[in-house]
């Protein structure tokens, strides 16, 4: 482990000294028997007061003489002789406390002068406006509710280190308004989605997180062991097969918002634990799904941000416009127009081109890959990152879509789409395969690929086949990456910015 630099060591020493001093103050509070009281109830919140009385002048507030009780974290303190000020932040926003010994008493005022930034404080008093126009609480009672032992980051620089922001998200939330705004927008977006689904007669359900057989996606699972049953189990990579069992059971419209787990790499777009919404609707197909998904995402933006026009990484994006639709080869030729139809149908050319682009075509997934899989790989190298505006890529090859219904008109193609925005996949949906014999054959093909070394190939799920044998109506199903959608709505460049506690290496 590398030794800390001199500046780092100095900062650590200073912080240790501050913590020691604050612990001394806490000991004094314990001796007085008032260290951590729990008998204060706020009557108002900062943001509500700021909003309701934004236009009230000093005279109007004095005439109203509104009694308030407010609590929060002390973010700023100015001691000025016989009158002092504190900026206090609660869960909604900030408001100023005005403190004088005449109002709170000399003993409380002297104690207040020793309180530290970060302390949780509470006040009762009257709402008024200072001579400088600041809405404030003129405190008649002031209390310390919880002592902060660690100092907050410098108010001018905040948390400069990105990893520290992720590792100590609690501090990031205290000092970074933008972080708090991101997660409030996330909550609004998810609430919007739930309402949208409910209004469309979908039923929210919960399906298992521990699976005896991983399925529903091409991914490497986390493996665990169930001691009581003495059996190997897997954290779910997708809820798909369980949700479709519910369609078989007669619930014609279902959805689930929950976590998936995939034992794969970490990147700006990937976290091993992530949130997805999957939904399934009987008597629909992938065309219906595209229209529905487009409306859902547009509404989530409006409810979370107040508009369907957003800015992402400096570029404007209008989600109110109709989303584009392209096939895989159309997308390739749009962004790499030198490729001819003949080249895109030539196995040897595609393999050579992928190799030229740095793709290892000797991987197990490529050993028996057909034209469709090779075209998809070329699309990922040449076109995917260029799909800035919302674009449905449609008609995926059957060999990479083992759960999707085959097209009635084009052999080897499925009724499947993926939605890309700002070069990232946001959603994946298709007309569901409901033919049990076809599904069993595709599972067997996946097992062959797994035996050949493809760790992401699917297992054979005999119980799911049994469910299909009872008859599943024609169905459309879609999965939407909630984290990536929130990245888009909050102008966040990495998935870690929209996860409260993203996975990091252990802190040694």
Swiss-Prot record:
Cofactor binding comment, as recorded: Binds 3 Mg(2+) ions per subunit.
Record EC number: 6.1.1.6
Keywords per UniProt: Aminoacyl-tRNA synthetase, ATP-binding, Cytoplasm, Ligase, Magnesium, Metal-binding, Nucleotide-binding, Protein biosynthesis
A matching Pfam family: tRNA_anti-codon
Catalytic activity: tRNA(Lys) + L-lysine + ATP = L-lysyl-tRNA(Lys) + AMP + diphosphate
A GO molecular function held by the record: tRNA binding
GO cellular component, as recorded: cytosol
Primary subcellular site in the record, as a coarse category: cytoplasm
Superkingdom as given in the UniProt entry: Bacteria
SUPFAM superfamilies assigned: Class II aaRS and biotin synthetases, Nucleic acid-binding proteins
PROSITE patterns in UniProt: AA_TRNA_LIGASE_II
Binding partners and assembly: Homodimer.
Similarity comment: Belongs to the class-II aminoacyl-tRNA synthetase family.
Name of protein: Lysine--tRNA ligase
Protein species of origin: Burkholderia pseudomallei (strain K96243)
């Amino acid at each position: 482990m590398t030794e800390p630099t001199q500046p780092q060591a100095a900062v650590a020493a200073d912080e240790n000294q501050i913590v020691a001093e604050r612990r001394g103050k806490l000991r004094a509070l314990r001796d007085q028997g008032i260290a951590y009281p729990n008998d204060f109830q706020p009557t108002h919140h900062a943001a509500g007061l700021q909003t309701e009385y934004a236009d009230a002048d000093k005279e109007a507030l004095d005439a109203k003489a509104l009694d308030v009780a407010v609590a929060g974290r002390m973010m700023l303190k100015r001691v000025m002789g016989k009158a002092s000020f504190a900026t206090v932040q609660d869960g909604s926003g900030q408001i100023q406390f005005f403190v004088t010994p005449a109002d709170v008493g000399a003993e409380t005022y002297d104690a207040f002068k020793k309180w530290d930034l970060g302390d949780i404080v509470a006040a009762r008093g009257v709402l008024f406006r200072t001579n400088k126009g600041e809405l404030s609480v003129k405190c008649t009672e002031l209390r310390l509710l919880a002592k902060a032992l660690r100092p907050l980051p410098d108010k001018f620089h905040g948390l400069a280190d990105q990893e520290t922001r992720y590792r100590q998200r609690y501090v990031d939330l205290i000092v970074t308004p933008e972080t708090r705004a991101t997660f409030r927008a996330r909550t609004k977006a998810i609430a919007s989605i739930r309402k949208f689904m409910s209004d469309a007669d979908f039923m929210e359900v919960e399906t298992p997180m521990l699976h005896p057989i991983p399925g529903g996606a091409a991914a490497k699972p986390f493996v665990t062991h169930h001691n009581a049953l003495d059996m190997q189990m897997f954290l779910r990579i997708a809820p798909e097969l369980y949700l479709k069992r519910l369609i078989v059971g007669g619930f014609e419209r279902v959805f689930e918002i929950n976590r998936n787990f995939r034992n794969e790499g970490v990147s700006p777009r990937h976290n091993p634990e992530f949130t997805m919404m999957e939904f399934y609707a009987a008597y629909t197909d992938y065309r219906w799904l595209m229209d529905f998904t487009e409306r859902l995402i547009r509404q989530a933006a409006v409810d979370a941000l107040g508009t369907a026009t957003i800015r992402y990484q400096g570029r404007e994006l209008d989600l109110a416009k109709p989303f584009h639709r392209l096939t895989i080869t159309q997308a390739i030729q749009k962004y790499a127009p030198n490729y001819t139809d003949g080249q895109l149908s030539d196995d040897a050319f595609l393999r050579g081109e992928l190799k030229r682009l740095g793709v290892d075509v000797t991987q197990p997934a490529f050993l028996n890959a057909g034209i469709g899989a090779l075209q998809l790989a070329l699309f990922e190298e040449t076109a995917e990152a260029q799909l800035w505006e919302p674009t449905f890529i449609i008609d995926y090859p059957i060999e990479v879509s083992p759960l999707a219904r085959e097209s009635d008109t084009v052999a080897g193609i499925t009724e499947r789409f993926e939605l890309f925005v700002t070069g990232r996949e946001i959603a994946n949906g298709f007309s569901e395969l409901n033919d049990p014999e076809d599904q069993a054959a595709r599972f067997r093909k996946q097992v062959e690929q797994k035996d050949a070394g493809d760790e992401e190939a699917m297992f054979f799920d005999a119980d799911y086949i049994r469910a299909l044998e009872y008859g599943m109506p024609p169905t459309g199903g879609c999965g939407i990456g909630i984290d990536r959608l929130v990245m888009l709505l909050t102008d966040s460049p990495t998935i870690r910015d929209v996860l409260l506690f993203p996975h990091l290496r252990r802190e040694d």
